[in-house]
Amino acid sequence: MATGELGDLGGYYFRFLPQKTFQSLSSKEITSRLRQWSMLGRIKAQAFGFDQTFQSYRKDDFVMAFFKDPNVIPNLKLLSDSSGQWIILGTEVKKIEAINVPCTQLSMSFFHRLYDEDIVRDSGHIVKCLDSFCDPFLISDELRRVLLVEDSEKYEIFSQPDREEFLFCLFKHLCLGGALCQYEDVISPYLETTKLIYKDLVSVRKNPQTKKIQITSSVFKVSAYDSAGMCYPSAKNHEQTFSYFIVDPIRRHLHVLYHCYGVGDMS
């Protein structure tokens, strides 16, 4: 049987946790930023609990069981491609894909190289460049150039493993935004928002032996397919349409971070 197809799902059961709030997406300041970036009303975090020990090598069984669970089906939200309204999936998932996303970064010093390489000035202002397109994104500054243009001079300041890190993915998604994104002139709103969302989603603990802080969460980028093709996070594939599953194996919590590319709420 192909990876991620329905088989022995190992007895995972889930429960929706509507009482869990994500301040990083709902505070007044962040809401204002998401509106400017054309992501407001199109990004959502939800929390679920589960009842079995999570084992990362069984991630496909875990994710498939999630989509089949009667407590998930009426509660997992996604945006309708046709109406733009929040809906539930409403179709039977036949196959899933869960890609491991490394999550090891404990500090925003990861982004100091943006200053070191003159992509951001000491003042925090992002260095401008001549306009170009990397479809569908307008590139008008050095930040978007280093994020998107593989043959650009400074692309390699972030290695491929760096770019796969959840912290980098989150930062890049916020920088690129939605369909009518108004870009920031300074770097701080992107860094601050990335940090707040990351801290809200990712779990850490102090190692009892070494006394060092370590990340306990596992992160996966998830897609689901019905008999017609991809149905989640959307039937339409886009770099800015995503769903990340952040699994805390100790608390047995699953955080789902979802965004669907489009025109965000203006009001």
UniProtKB/Swiss-Prot annotation:
UniProtKB keywords: Cell projection, Ciliopathy, Cytoplasm, Cytoskeleton, Disease variant, Kartagener syndrome, Primary ciliary dyskinesia
Record bears the keyword Cytoplasm: yes
InterPro entries in the cross-refs: CFAP300
Record has Cytoplasm as a keyword: yes
Subcellular location: Cytoplasm; Cytoplasm, Cytoskeleton, Cilium axoneme
Induction trigger: Up-regulated during ciliogenesis.
Tissue expression pattern: Expressed in nasal epithelial cells.
Disulfide-bonded cysteines: none
Gene Ontology cellular component annotations, sorted alphabetically: cytoplasm; cytoskeleton; motile cilium
Subunit organization: Interacts with DNAAF2.
Family according to the record: Belongs to the CFAP300 family.
Associated disease: Ciliary dyskinesia, primary, 38: A form of primary ciliary dyskinesia, a disorder characterized by abnormalities of motile cilia. Respiratory infections leading to chronic inflammation and bronchiectasis are recurrent, due to defects in the respiratory cilia. Some patients exhibit randomization of left-right body asymmetry and situs inversus. Primary ciliary dyskinesia associated with situs inversus is referred to as Kartagener syndrome. CILD38 inheritance is autosomal recessive.
Function summary: Cilium- and flagellum-specific protein that plays a role in axonemal structure organization and motility. May play a role in outer and inner dynein arm assembly.
Official protein name in the record: Cilia- and flagella-associated protein 300
Taxon lineage: Eukaryota, Metazoa, Chordata, Craniata, Vertebrata
